[in-house]
Amino acid sequence: MSSDSTPEGFVHEQRAVRVVFRAGSCAELPREVERLGLDRVAVVAGRRYADRVAGMLGARAVVVVADPRMHVPVEQAEAVRDRATAARVDGLVAVGGGSAVGLAKAVALTHRVPIVAVPTSFSGSEMTRVWGTTAGGVKRTGRDPVVAPRVVLYDPELLAGFPTALAVPSAFNALAHAVEARYAPDRTPVTDLVAEAAIGTMLTALPALAADDPAGRAGALRGAWMCGMSLDSTSMSLHHKLAHVIGGGFALPHAETHTVLLPHVLGYNAAAAPDAAAAVGAALPGGAEPSAAGRALQSFAAGLGAPTRLADLGLPRDALDRVVDTVLDAPYANPAPLDRAALRELVERAWSGAPVP
């Protein structure tokens, strides 16, 4: 049995969620809100969708937030919470990417009201009970079942026009959830199956997504659904810790940070998590041995035009030691030991874009 095979003993938790996946499903939003018995909802959506969604919901939309910000700044979360209190909201509708869903989660955390989510990116956040806010350059995360959307409407038509320069990193963001779920210490036979299916679905969809093919967008959306499912039932490890420290601490773009880091962390963990590395290697075009999966994933990402250097995202080189120190101050469980020197080499390579060893 390999070192990252599913433990013989495990605890598996699965929450109830209604998922509607079909073209045009966004039009079903009013019916789903009514089905939950919601009368006074706060709409959290990007500017592209806010007015449209508010119009669909009519008098039920008592608050409209059209400017969700990346990494959920706590000051914005508090402001929207105050508006929700004043309007006596009994539910939330989040339409957009991870920022919209994340802000809705921050409000649900304090107001204990249900969320209906309509994702327009591949973040996978809509399928998890994970929440996060950022204050003073520090990203704080946690888990609470109340923040997990009760209903998720996946509508591939909403992704038409999603620029490939943003879509591809968004898909890698979701992929990271499944990769870490596959080597999580609390994985189960179910999460292993979902994570491997998610990895295969997303890596298969990515070339078509990069070519702006509608089939690629639909495939990546299915992959994001499964990637989020796998993360919802497992713990996060080194990859997510690094992404939270770097993204939240230095205001780097969220999905792009995940994209750069994932091959390096996979390479770091490959020997200790060969099953996860094998799942990635098997799904890549042409295949790759587990020991080479990290480098193969890096080459694959570069070939799709994805970012490969933290330096290009705005991380200063003199911040690398601080990144490592912050990760080690409160580490997440990880299959490979967190050695400071090795971790420092990892972030240096990710910063410069050097090949994964």
What are these regions (language model features)?
Residues 181, 185-296:
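Active-site segments that bind and position negatively charged phosphate/pyrophosphate groups
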